[in-house]
Amino acid sequence: MENIAHIFCNPEEEYWTIPPIKSFLKENDVKVDNVSAIKENTKTKLIDAAMDFAEQNEENKQIFIEWIDRTVKEGIKEIILHKCQMDEGMNLTFANEASTRKFLDMYVDTESTGYLINSKYDNKTRMVKYTLSKIRDKRAITLYFGKMITYIDKRKSKCRDIEFPVIFEYFIDEGWYLVRYKARSNLYEYHPEFQNEYMKTDYPVQDSKLVQEAVQQAMHILQLKEITGSEQSYFLKKMFYRILKQFTETPPEIKDRLDQYKNNIISMEQNIKELCRISEGQTFSLHSDLCNLFEKYISINWLDKEIFTRHRKAYPIKLRATDEEDSHVDQTAGGDSGPLQSKAIFFDNKRMIDNDEMCDGLTLKWKRSVRTYYPETFTVRISEKRGKCYLSFKEYTAEEDIQDVLFSIIGA
C-alpha cells in the first residue's frame, strides 16, 4: 500500500499502543499467532497484521485508513480547551451542513487524500480534512492540520522526517474550542534540501509553535476570537473547584459517623470557646475546623478506602491551589497509593480551598468506559495557564473516555 507505513504506523512513534491495535484486529476478525512475550516484538507483529489486513483489498484499506484517523485523534495526547466567540456573520454559514461543507471545502489542501495517511506534507501547515459531527448532541466542526518536520533522535544519532498532526475541534453552540496534539521534543524545521543532518539542527522548533500555527489557521478559517483576560483564569479555577467537590463528596458512611459525634463536636466547640475566649464572629470558623478535624481522622483511619472511589467515575490523586494571601498548596497522594481524600494532607488544606472555592489544577484517576484490553483507570492532569485549560493524557485513552473528561469540565 502506497506510503502506508509512515509515522502513524511506526511502532517508535507511539501513536498506537497494544490495546487499540488488538481491538482493531478483534473487530475485523484478524487472528495473530505466535505473539512474542517481548512487548516491542508484540507491537511490531500486531501492526504488521493490521497492515496485512489493509492490503488485502480496497474495502479493508478504507476501514484501516479511517481507523488511523480515529486513533490519531485519541490516545496519548495534550489537549488545550479554551472559550471563544464566533463572528456573528458565520452563524448563517454554519446553519446547515450543506453551507458548512461548501465553506470549508475552500480551505482543504488540494493535494489532500481526505485522510491523514498518504496526504502530501511539506514545511507549511495545511488543512488536510474536516469532519462535521454531533458529539454527545453538541454540534462540532473538526479540522485536521498537518506539517512535515524533522525529528532527531540524539541517542541513536539519527534523524527522520515525520508528519506533525494537530486536530482542532470547535463546538458551535457551546463556544469552546479544543486542540489535540502529541507532545514532542527534538524537533527541527523541515528542509529537504539539506542532506547533512547537522545543518538541520540550525532550525529548532518547539511543538507549541507548530500547534499555534494550526490554531491561528483554524481561528482564521472559522472566524473565531479567543476570550482572554484574568476573568477567564478565574472562571476555569472555579470550574476545577466544582470538579474537585464533585469527586470528593463526603461518603455516606463517614457522614453517618460524623452525625454520631455531633454532640462531641458541640461540646468541644463550647469548651474551646470558653478556654480561648473566642468571639461570636469566629464561631462558624471554629465549628468548620472541628468538623474537618473529625472527618480527617475518621477518613484516614477508615479501613475500606474504596468508599472514596466506589461510586465515582474519578477521584483526585493530586491538586494545586493558591489562596488570596498567596499561600500555596501542592498535595499528592503519593504514587498510586490511593485517593487523595484518604490522606491527611487533603484535610490539612481543605478549609483554605473551600474558603476561596478555587483550584489551580488537579490530577485525577478516571474510570474507563472502554475497558477491553485496557487497565481499569487512566490518569489525566488538568491545569490552567493564561486563561486556557490544559489536559494531559500520558497513557493511551480512548475517544469516549477523553470525551467524558472534556464534558465533565465544560459542564462543571
Language-model region placement:
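Intrinsically disordered, low-complexity, charge-rich terminal extensions
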Residues: 1-412
